[in-house]
């Protein structure tokens, strides 16, 4: 069997696909700006205009650096980000998708990534240069040889530098919080392979429209809103995460305005969108939406149900809601539900979801029931459920291992960490070597994949495994003063025994006093005791905005545990 990680020969690279459209005057990328216009102002580049701008960026990069060097993308989320990314690829350099310092909540991550990869050149927009100079003054980051505002460059002729599929295209910094930043090395071949896999899974072609608001420095945003449109030759329409958070209905209005829409978001976004339904969406037609990818964080049955209930009257089809699974180390996409099938939920016995345990399906009203949403089947890559290096049969929980042409080449200049993650050896398997250990736990049931949680996040008490997300759901349902999806459960050791701690934000609507704080704590502890037969070692109620989240919106439990142990949470 050939090594799937190097099976690139039949793939057209994404940068080649873009260059091939240099003579096309049709619309390519549209950025909708809500900053100064409540209804949004669209700014569009045709394929030919985009190609000319990209060549101008590449020409300038070639003047100040060399192929193979790192180029940091520090543009605001607009068309400059797109031209900067492809400019680096045309120049044969390694793009590093990051963000302008205006995303202040991720400043530590930005500084860490810059220090890790030491890019020679920073690309940005003219309006953002002041923020980068301030960053250099305030933080110990390596100074670039050149800071370039891509929106000020004159057009120049430039011939794209030939690259091989095995060469790095960009470094995708993961949003983990337990160790130093890690840049997954995404090769040109891996990107092309993942674009092909996404196209196969969701039927993306030239008539599709990729639309959304995901941050372009995040793997799901970069692939779905930038690389996929270029590889498929379809239109991209995007706005900013801030525009969505301010008014979630903007997302639904956007996807209703274009044909054949493919859009993607984490689970929490569907919660937001469902709550925005009502008069604000009167007259909206979502019948042309082909695919809404739900991924990047645990997918909740109640979210899926609420979203379908809110958007069904607007013409949205349940089968268009596509729960999926992916991660940066696999470029982004791994698996999805089958075209034409509505989301599927199975209720498992939560006491039998530990690694190596055989699962049991129970009725939904059983006290032990936990509903899990299927994320379907892997597309174009091998997926195995593994315990101690051996594949386990369907129905047994294990770590998800992956092998395919879309898998990253490792972490940038971190050999030990790369070997730990990317050199999994499968006993009695084929291929035997080169498996990606994802760190995610899952189970196959009736041939479909269900994600049960993160291996490193498991809370083990008296030999029993507990998933933190299950405890978090129980706590947030215990009292209306607890803010939804803004809490973290993790384990700490006390007096020689390990037990759970929950840190939860209260809602912005409540005025907290000692009496209410005590009431919330008592109800949270009682709910966890009833539901999970666990005693919380501590329950901490904190103000809104306290709970740390990753760039993709996931709860950063390890970071919260660290902050708790450091006494930072009161």
Residue spans of the language-model regions?
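AMP-dependent adenylate-forming
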Residues: 16-46, 168-171, 178, 326, ...
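Conserved pre-ATP/AMP-binding loop-to-beta segment of ANL
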Residues: 27, 148, 155-173, 179-180, ...
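Conserved AMP-binding/adenylate-forming core of the ANL superfamily
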Residues: 29-86, 103-111, 183-192
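AMP-binding/adenylate-forming catalytic core of the ANL superfamily
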Residues: 122, 256, 263, 404, ...
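Conserved AMP-binding/adenylation subdomain of ANL enzymes
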Residues: 192-209, 219-261, 276-279
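Gly/Ser/Thr-rich phosphate-binding loop
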Residues: 260-264, 276-367, 382-384, 389
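Conserved ATP-binding/catalytic segment of the ANL
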Residues: 373-381, 386, 390-395, 399-461
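Conserved C-terminal "lid"/linker of ANL adenylate-forming enzymes
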Residues: 485-490, 501-502, 525-570
């Amino acid at each position: 069997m050939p090594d799937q990680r190097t099976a690139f020969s039949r793939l057209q690279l994404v940068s080649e696909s873009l260059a091939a459209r240099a003579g096309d005057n049709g619309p390519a990328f549209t950025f909708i700006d809500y900053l100064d216009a409540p209804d949004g102002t669209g700014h569009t580049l045709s394929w030919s205009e985009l190609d000319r701008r990209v060549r101008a960026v590449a020409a300038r990069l070639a003047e100040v650096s060399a192929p193979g060097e790192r180029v940091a993308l520090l543009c605001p989320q607009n068309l400059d980000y797109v031209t900067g990314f492809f400019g680096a690829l045309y120049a044969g350099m390694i793009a590093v998708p990051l963000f302008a310092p205006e995303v202040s909540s991720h400043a530590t991550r930005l500084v860490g990534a810059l220090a890790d990869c030491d890019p020679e050149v920073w690309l940005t927009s003219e309006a953002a240069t002041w923020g980068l100079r301030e960053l250099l003054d305030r933080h110990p980051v390596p100074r670039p040889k050149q800071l370039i505002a891509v929106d000020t460059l004159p057009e120049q002729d430039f011939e794209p530098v030939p690259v091989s599929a095995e060469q790095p295209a960009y470094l995708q910094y993961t949003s983990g919080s337990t160790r130093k930043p890690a840049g997954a090395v995404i090769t040109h071949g891996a990107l092309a392979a993942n674009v092909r896999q996404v196209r196969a899974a969701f039927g993306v072609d030239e008539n599709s429209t990729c639309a959304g608001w995901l941050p372009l420095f995040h793997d799901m945003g970069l692939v779905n809103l930038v690389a996929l449109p270029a590889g498929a030759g379809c239109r991209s329409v995007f706005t900013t995460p801030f525009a969505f958070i301010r008014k979630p209905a903007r997302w639904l209005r956007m996807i209703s305005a274009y044909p054949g829409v493919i859009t993607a978001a984490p689970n929490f976004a569907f919660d937001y969108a469902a709550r925005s339904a009502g008069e604000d969406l009167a007259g909206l037609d979502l019948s042309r939406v082909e695919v809404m990818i739900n991924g990047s964080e645990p997918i909740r049955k109640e979210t899926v149900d609420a979203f379908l209930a809110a958007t069904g009257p607007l013409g949205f089809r349940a089968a268009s809601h596509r729960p999926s699974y992916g991660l940066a180390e696999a470029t982004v996409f791994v698996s999805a539900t089958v075209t034409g099938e509505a989301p599927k939920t199975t209720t498992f016995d939560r006491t039998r979801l530990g690694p190596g345990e055989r699962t049991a399906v129970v009725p939904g009203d059983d006290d032990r029931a936990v509903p899990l949403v299927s994320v379907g089947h892997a597309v174009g890559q091998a997926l195995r459920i593994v315990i101690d290096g051996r594949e386990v049969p369907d129905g047994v929980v294990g770590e998800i291992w992956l092998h395919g042409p879309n898998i990253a080449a490792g972490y940038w200049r971190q050999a030990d960490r790369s070997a730990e993650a990317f050199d999994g050896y499968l006993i009695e398997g084929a291929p035997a070597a080169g498996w990606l250990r994802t760190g995610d736990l899952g189970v196959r049931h009736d041939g479909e994949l269900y994600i049960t949680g993160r291996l490193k996040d498991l809370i083990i008490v008296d030999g029993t495994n507990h998933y933190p997300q299950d405890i978090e759901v129980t706590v947030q349902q215990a009292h209306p003063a607890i803010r939804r999806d803004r809490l973290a459960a993790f384990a700490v050791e006390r007096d020689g025994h390990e037990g759970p701690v929950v840190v939860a934000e209260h809602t912005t609507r409540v005025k907290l006093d000692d009496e209410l704080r005590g009431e919330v704590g008592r109800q949270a502890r009682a709910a966890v005791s009833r539901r999970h037969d666990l005693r919380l070692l501590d329950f901490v109620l904190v103000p809104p905005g306290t709970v740390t989240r990753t760039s993709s919106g996931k709860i950063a439990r390890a970071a919260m545990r660290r902050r708790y142990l450091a006494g930072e949470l009161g």
